[in-house]
Amino acid sequence: RVAAKEGELFTPALLRSRELWQELGAGYGRDILLPAGALSVAPSDHPDLQPTLASIEHFDLPHKIFDAAQMRLRFPQFHIEDDDIGVLDLLGGAMRPEMAVAAATDQAFSHGASAIYDTEVLDIVETSNGVLVRTSRGEFTADRVVVTAGPWTARLLPELRDVVQTKTFALTWLMP
């Protein structure tokens, strides 16, 4: 999605992220992003919809808004309350995560990166000579590292605990 319920502050980064994923996919010869749209459904006065609508207006994002009757016709798979509306972010969609990882890894390798698989990272320490990575298989040094630890980021990099927060979101993907 590009119209962010977290607020307009995120929209430029989301737009740029979308461009970068499209570029990566084009370089890989495969579509990483599937342009399916992103539908938000809530009562019309729900606080999460206001920032989404503000992002749409401020950045003139392509979208569609459906009232409850239109939602029931277009999306019969959902139980729609009378005061619900649907906001369809036409730039939203789904990502193929395995393909994204493969494409990003291939691109990193083409720029001289290396990877160590099936190894638990215990610690990452910045040193005057670069980065020291302590693992279950020993220590490695590098000029720089890319950390993609997902929900383990705060444990691995405790200094980011206040900045990086893992949240679970329930998502539903449906075929038209």
Regions found by a protein language model. Name each.
Residues 1-74:
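Dinucleotide-binding Rossmann-like beta1-alpha1 core, especially the glycine-rich loop
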Residues 14-21, 108, 150, 169:
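Short amphipathic alpha-helical/adjacent loop interface patches that line ligand
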Residues 38, 84, 167-171:
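Short hydrophobic/aromatic beta-strand or adjacent loop that forms the aromatic wall/cage
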Residues 40, 132, 171-173:
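Conserved hydrophobic/aromatic beta-strand scaffold that supports enzyme active sites
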Residues 47, 123, 152-155:
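Glycine-rich nucleotide phosphate-binding loop and flanking beta-alpha elements
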Residues 48-49, 75-83, 125-132:
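A short, glycine/Asx- and small/polar-enriched loop/turn
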Residues 87-144, 148-149:
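Helical element adjacent to the flavin cofactor pocket in flavoenzyme catalytic cores
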Residues 138-176:
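Central helical "cap/lid" subdomain
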